[in-house]
Amino acid sequence: MIYENLDSIDRTKAHRAKLTLLCEARQGTRAWVRVRLDDLSQAGFRITWLPQFSLGMPLRIRIPSMQVLTASIRWHSGKTLGCEFAEPLHVAVFEHIVRNAVIDGPLSR
C-alpha cells in the first residue's frame, strides 16, 4: 500500500493516497455520472469530471465495493473537484479502498 502520513500542519491530518479509481457520483436527483477519483484521504477526495455541479449541494459518490458516501464540494478548478466526506473514513475502510485501487505512488505536495 502506497500512501503517506501528512504532518500535523496539513488540514486533512490523515493518510493520503494518489490513486486512480473509476466511481460514480451525483448531486440531488441528477443521474449518476462516471468520475475518476485521483486522490483519497480519510477526510476527502479529488475527482475529475462532474458536469453541472452545485457547490452548495451535497454530493454522493459510489466507490466500487463500498456503500454510497456523502461529501461536500470544497473547491473546484476546471473539471476537477475537491470534496470532503460528511464523516471521515475509518482507517480500515481507507486502506481497503487503497488496496483495491490502481496505485500511482505517494501524493507529493
Annotated model-derived regions:
Residues G28, Q42-A43, H76-L81:
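Short, conserved beta-turn/loop elements at beta-strand boundaries and strand-helix junctions
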Residues R34-R36, T70-R74:
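Short beta-strand-centered aromatic/proline hotspots
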Residues M1-L40, V91-R109:
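N-terminal helix initiation/capping motif
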Residues T29-A31, S65-Q67, K79:
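Short acidic/polar mixed-charge low-complexity motifs
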Residues L21-R26, G56-S65:
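Short conserved beta-strand and strand-loop elements enriched in small hydrophobics
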Residues F45-W49, K79-P88, A92-V93:
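Short, solvent-exposed secondary-structure boundary/capping segments
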